Amino acid sequence: MKTQTLQKIKGYAYDKFSCYKGCQHGLDHALRVVNNAKRMVKILKVEKRIDVNLLYASCWLHDIAVIDKNNNVISSLYFHFFESSINKKHIRRVLERFPLSKSEFQTIVNAIINHPHSIPYRSLNRNGDIYLKILQDADSFDYISDERLKSFNSNRWYLTPISNLYICLVKKNIKYFLNYPELAKYIDQF
């Protein structure tokens, strides 16, 4: 993928996410997922085997469908359970704005549709392509990040003890929620 195309995708994500008021899937989340993916590329030593721009584009857009939902409990639950289906309907329209090859288009679509639910459902993609696997693991590491936990707890103080315990348990067992379980030993870098 051309760097120009990645910059257009990044700009689009910035514009869209800057308007979104949800605490769990905003611009900060997308940026953390991109940074997690960058760390993983280095740890896994795959820089020369993949198109990193294509990976980062997938990371920037992986939750773009969430900005079209209402920010309430019912809408959030619906989105959580049907995220793959919602992404499937939404992502193609988004990607048509950008000059992508057919292969780039399909790689991003596949990664975004199939990335949800490693945590808590262990719906992994170990047989998927590297773009999907890294995106899913980068998103999983953000799921257990201190920043995201603080964000969650700030709006739901009454759930703080339960959410803290839950995240602690997931962190201790993170290797079971990753396509690349060897990344678990680097948990402090994410």
Map each language-model feature to its residues:
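Short alpha-helical hairpin
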Residues: 1-16, 60
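Divalent metal-dependent phosphate-bond-processing catalytic cores, especially two-metal-ion Mg2+/Mn2+ enzymes
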Residues: 19-48, 61, 71, 117-190
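Alpha-helix N-cap/helix-initiation sites
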Residues: 23-26, 48-54, 101-105
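Inter-helical turn/loop segments and adjacent helix faces that build the functional surface
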Residues: 44-47, 94-102
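His-Asp-centered metal-binding catalytic motifs of divalent-metal-dependent phosphohydrolases/nucleases
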Residues: 50-79, 83, 87, 109-117, ...
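Internal catalytic-core helix/loop-beta-alpha segment
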Residues: 102-124
